[in-house]
Regions:
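Short loop/turn motifs at secondary-structure junctions and domain boundaries
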Residues: 47, 107-112
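Regulatory sensory and allosteric helical modules in signal-transduction proteins
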Residues: 58-108
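Intrinsically disordered, low-complexity terminal regulatory regions
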Residues: 1-67
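A short, aliphatic-rich beta-strand micro-motif
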Residues: 114-121
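Short coil/loop residues immediately preceding or within conserved phosphate-binding loops
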Residues: 50, 115, 127
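Short beta-strand-to-loop transition segments that serve as allosteric relay/switch motifs
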Residues: 129-134
Length: 134
């Protein structure tokens, strides 16, 4: 496992291309989901200096906060509520350039201005979401 990230200063695409194999190396051989999610959030936050990055995991009818990096976050989000709950319900990645313009946005922090939420699927079902705020 690599303990230090090699960060490059290129285009966003070049930065992501450089980071992906490093993240794969971080999680390779580790079977604990929480440990892997924690390392992924740390790597993304360090590489891109996002305001907040973390995971929510599906527990019955809501998303429950999982490993994250950043300020204190909302602990539970219902399906269809906010950007995370909507991405879960629609099984679609949502890119929101202005969170104030998103109907029903949940403001965990007024400092967050934009958000990307990526649903994580297995066998066609969402088991969690990756949430990134800038």
């Amino acid at each position: 496992m690599s303990e230090n990230l090699i960060l490059i200063s290129g285009s966003k695409e070049e930065q992501y291309s450089s980071l992906l194999p490093q993240i794969k190396s971080l999680v390779e051989g580790e079977t604990d989901l929480i440990a892997n999610l924690a390392n992924v959030t740390a790597a993304l936050k360090e590489a891109f200096r996002f305001f907040w990055v973390g995971f929510y995991l599906v527990k019955e009818n809501e998303l429950v906060l999982a490993p994250f990096q950043g300020p204190i976050a909302c602990t539970r989000i219902r399906k269809g509520r906010g950007v995370c709950g909507t991405a879960w319900q629609e099984k679609q990645t949502l890119i929101v350039p202005d969170v104030d313009a998103f109907p029903g946005h949940i403001a965990c922090s007024s400092l967050s201005r934009s958000e990307i939420v990526v649903p994580l699927l297995k066998d066609g079902e969402v088991w969690g979401v990756l949430d990134i705020d800038s």
